[in-house]
Amino acid sequence: LKTTPLTLRSPFLHRLPLRALKTHKPTSLHISKSSISASLEAGVGVMATKLGMMSFFEESGTVVPVTVVGFREGNIVTQIKTEATDGYNAVQVGYRRVRDRKLTKPEMGHLEKSGIIPLRHLQEFRLQSIDGFEVTQKLDFGELFKEGDLVDVSGTTIGKGFQGGIKRHNFKRGQMTHGSKSHRQLGSIGAGTTPGRVYKGKKMPGRMGGTKRKIRKLKIVKIDDQLNIIMIKGALPGKPGNLLRIAPAKIVGKNIPKS
């Protein structure tokens, strides 16, 4: 009996499902250099508490709107991660002292392992080098920053609840007179038979606010060591009492590699 070689044009293969012809190759995790550099911080930062806004008069007489930021007990290095143990270099910082019962047992065990007081918030700062940092080290804002420096500030915006399209997306309202019954309604959300559906991402009423936002390249106007506060030019996310994350501003090519 003669056997013909099996090829992709064989009629037998056309009756097989497509998934039977696929060959599964082992996939390897590939992390590009651009994603690594994008996650790097320009330097270690601190956490702080938003206190409110006010006007600040510069020496030239210019009035500048500033946000007053205060510091509670904390900003202590709780853990140092290295490429050998964790695959990347990072400094973990704790902020805001609380009572023991406010933390879970795993959180308490993590801090007690290093002999650190109970801290409510833990955040990491991924760095190129972790030289000069040690556990239980106290981070002083005045030693890390100076007046005139640019910083990136992250925080959670004020939650507005469920809002309509006018407030949430700045839509225009409809006619208020001339027989109109749709004053603040959304209006048309798509076509008819084609495409026969509503496109994903359509701006519609929904929950507004309560999301994480980062404001970049804000100027430090004033540092007051006696009152333990700083003043940052502009508005910061959240309401008074909100947690803020302050880090050196990322400037690609200067303190962040291009690739």
Swiss-Prot record:
Recorded GO CC terms: chloroplast; ribonucleoprotein complex; ribosome
Pfam families noted in UniProt: Ribosomal_L3
UniProt keywords, alphabetically: Chloroplast, Plastid, Ribonucleoprotein, Ribosomal protein, RNA-binding, rRNA-binding, Transit peptide
Main location: plastid
Chain spans, region Disordered: 176-211
Cellular localisation: Plastid, Chloroplast
Regions of compositional bias (Basic residues) in chain numbering: 199-211
One function term, GO molecular function aspect: structural constituent of ribosome
Keyword Oxidoreductase annotated: no
Keyword RNA-binding on entry: yes
Disulphide bonds in the chain: none
Transit peptide boundaries: 1-37
An example Gene Ontology biological process: translation
Function: One of the primary rRNA binding proteins, it binds directly near the 3'-end of the 23S rRNA, where it nucleates assembly of the 50S subunit.
Similarity comment: family membership: Belongs to the universal ribosomal protein uL3 family.
Subunit note: Part of the 50S ribosomal subunit.
Name recorded for this polypeptide: Large ribosomal subunit protein uL3c
Species in which this protein is naturally found: Nicotiana tabacum (Common tobacco)
